[in-house]
């Protein structure tokens, strides 16, 4: 199953500052780029950055995104 926007994911890339940390998927690019998943973290790194791009195989889904409530009419 593909990773969706809003999912909580754990980073499995060992050289990453956020290795084994949990972040939220901000966006998923479907154009075919090498690192299509943008993940946002609560913790900032040494350069005051809190987002990074990852491949899907470098991430482990911890919690699926909550379904949006349908608007009542």
From Swiss-Prot:
Cystine pairings recorded for this chain: none
UniProt feature coiled coil, ranges: none
Topology within the bilayer: Peripheral membrane protein
GO annotations of cellular component type: photosystem I reaction center; plasma membrane-derived thylakoid membrane
Main localization (coarse): membrane
Keyword Membrane tagged: yes
InterPro entries found in the cross-reference section: Elect_transpt_acc-like_dom_sf (IPR008990), PSI_PsaE (IPR003375)
Keywords of the record: Membrane, Photosynthesis, Photosystem I, Thylakoid
Keyword Transmembrane helix included in the entry's annotation: no
Domain of life of the organism encoding this protein: Bacteria
Biological process annotations from GO: photosynthesis
Compartments where found: Cellular thylakoid membrane
Record's signal peptide: none
Gene3D superfamilies reported for this sequence: 2.30.30.50
SUPFAM superfamilies xrefs: Electron transport accessory proteins
Family named by the database record: Belongs to the PsaE family.
Function: Stabilizes the interaction between PsaC and the PSI core, assists the docking of the ferredoxin to PSI and interacts with ferredoxin-NADP oxidoreductase.
Alphabetical list of PANTHER family matching this protein: PHOTOSYSTEM I REACTION CENTER SUBUNIT IV A, CHLOROPLASTIC-RELATED, PHOTOSYSTEM I SUBUNIT IV
Protein's name in the database: Photosystem I reaction center subunit IV
Organism listed in the record: Synechococcus sp. (strain JA-3-3Ab) (Cyanobacteria bacterium Yellowstone A-Prime)
Protein encoded by which gene: psaE
């Amino acid at each position: 199953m593909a990773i969706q926007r809003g999912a909580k994911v754990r980073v499995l890339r060992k050289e990453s500052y956020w290795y084994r940390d949990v972040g939220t998927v901000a966006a998923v690019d479907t154009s075919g780029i090498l690192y299509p998943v943008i993940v946002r973290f609560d913790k900032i790194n040494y350069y005051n950055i809190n987002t990074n791009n990852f491949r899907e195989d470098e991430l482990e889904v911890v919690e699926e995104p909550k379904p949006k409530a349908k608007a009542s009419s």
